[in-house]
């Protein structure tokens, strides 16, 4: 399942990288929760991010085919260091 979710994330990666960030799949809870990590680079444009609730909805819609029981996507921002 992780490989399939990583492939979905790949489609979003260029947009995040354009703003100095990266994105990856974090924790996967089979009960229906996926963690998506937003990795903030040193020159990241934090103001460029859409609101987290909209981002979670966007990822959830894209990931539902892989994990039909998906209830929630948690967005976690990580800064280097």
Describe these PLM feature segments.
Residues 1-81:
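Domain-level signature for proteins that mediate thiol-based redox and metal-cofactor handling
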């Amino acid at each position: 399942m992780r490989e399939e979710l990583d492939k979905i994330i790949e489609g979003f990666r260029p947009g995040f990288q354009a703003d100095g960030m990266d994105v990856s799949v974090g924790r996967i809870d089979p009960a229906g929760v996926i963690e998506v990590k937003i990795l903030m680079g040193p020159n990241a444009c934090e103001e460029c991010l859409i609101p987290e609730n909209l981002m979670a909805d966007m990822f959830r819609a894209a990931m539902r085919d892989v994990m039909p029981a998906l209830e929630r996507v948690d967005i976690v921002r990580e800064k280097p260091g």
